[in-house]
Amino acid sequence: MVKEKEYYERLGVKPDCTEDELKKAYRKMAVKYHPDKNQGPGKDAAEAKFKDISEAYEVLSDPEKRKMYDSYGSEGMKESGFHASSAEDLFSHFFGAGGGGGGFSFGGGGGDDFGGFSFGNMGGMGGMGGMGGGHKKRRKGEDIEHEMNRSLEELYNGKLVKISISRDEVCKTCKGSGSNKPGVTTTCPTCNGSRYVFQKKQVGPGMIQQVQTACHTCHGTGEKIKEEDKCKECKGKRVIQGKKIVQFQVEKGTRDGERIMLQGQGSEYPGVPPGDVIITIREKPNVNFKRNGDNLIYTKRLKLLDSIAGSQFIINTLDQRKLWVNHEKGDIIKQGDMRYIENEGMPIKGTSRKGKLIIAFDIEYPSNLTNDDIEKLSKILPKAATPSVSKSDCKSVGLSKVNFNTNEQSSHGGAGGAYQQHGGAYGHQKQQQQGFNPADFGAQFGGGGPQQAQQCQQQ
């Protein structure tokens, strides 16, 4: 059983797919989304897709990386030090560009899966072991990936954001040549001009990962300059570290994990366009609302009388408005019940509409009642059911309160521990300590999956 399926889904294959099925899926999708084939309005989206499928194929085509991904998922890959290679380098290696003549080009159409793509004389495709095959020219500078935490209020209202990034910039002293003298470069002896070397890294018991990194001798250029000939400013690296302020708009309705691409704002390299800056948005938790797709879930605590006799209350929205909510008399609300308000949820990106504001009710019962109160209630509320067997045929037992604030344990693990282990019902005492969590019930409003919807229907 694999931990997650995202990489498989990017390529449209199943987790038990064969190596040939992986290659076929990557070949078809890489050609479809290659930047050279997508120059129209959807260029940015196609380029992001191209990078996603390349990252997925790089991992799944390597048996060691695939084994690690299946066991630990993408987070485990990150923790092991994995960084995706250039999508263009992977594409070039796969289709044989730079490996021994031939190459590839994009035509104007074609009726097959490859849409006019010409493979030419590619030679052998080979495996992913060495990424060799001679010097591969960069298509552009390196991309810079950045994760950014944004509040739910900002994702609701939208926000213009400015950040400072560190990036490589072409050295102005040597104009990116790495030397102040012409014609002094030679092929790097360490990487043989390929710009990359591979290092083995132990990431777990009996697990060795082969990590591709930029050559430490030539700093990923594929060329070597004698020490005495190197530019004094960049030390022969052709680029220096610089800072750049970038600005972008977080659109209303942006979701957790969504990526924003700032084209041409990434690292520079001589003779090629700059790379991109890719911002991944992470949603910070909110104390009042929980997001469920396009819906917002708000927990409202009601006293027992209000849940029966009706009530009015205020909800402060994420854009500083106030909603006067009228709960009509006769609409009896039970513990765990939900109601919703149309068009008061999260903005739906690209539209003027919003999702639903779902109100999940947590009913507050009185902590104690007098005999007089009980007598009055017994005249109004339905009578309790009488057991159908004789008391003399049963063992008579009483009830004791469970205290969730203590660490007392019985020989069977303690009532509180058992309650928390098995989930329990949403009892009043547990709610006071932890609060009602309605996240599992959002599916019926369009925010969750089939399992969540089934749970909601069973309430």
UniProtKB/Swiss-Prot annotation:
PROSITE patterns cross-referenced by the UniProt entry: DNAJ_1, DNAJ_2, ZF_CR
Chain positions recorded as Zn(2+) 2 binding sites: 188, 191, 215, 218
Keywords, alphabetical: Chaperone, Cytoplasm, Endoplasmic reticulum, Lipoprotein, Membrane, Metal-binding, Methylation, Microsome, Mitochondrion, Nucleus, Prenylation, Repeat, Zinc, Zinc-finger
Residues bearing a lipid moiety (S-farnesyl cysteine): 456
The protein's name in its UniProt record: DnaJ homolog subfamily A member 1 homolog
Domain J: 6-73
GO cellular-component term (any): membrane
Compartment(s) of residence: Membrane; Cytoplasm; Microsome; Mitochondrion
Propeptide intervals in chain numbering: 457-459
Swiss-Prot/TrEMBL CXXCXGXG motif repeat ranges: 171-178, 188-195, 215-222, 231-238
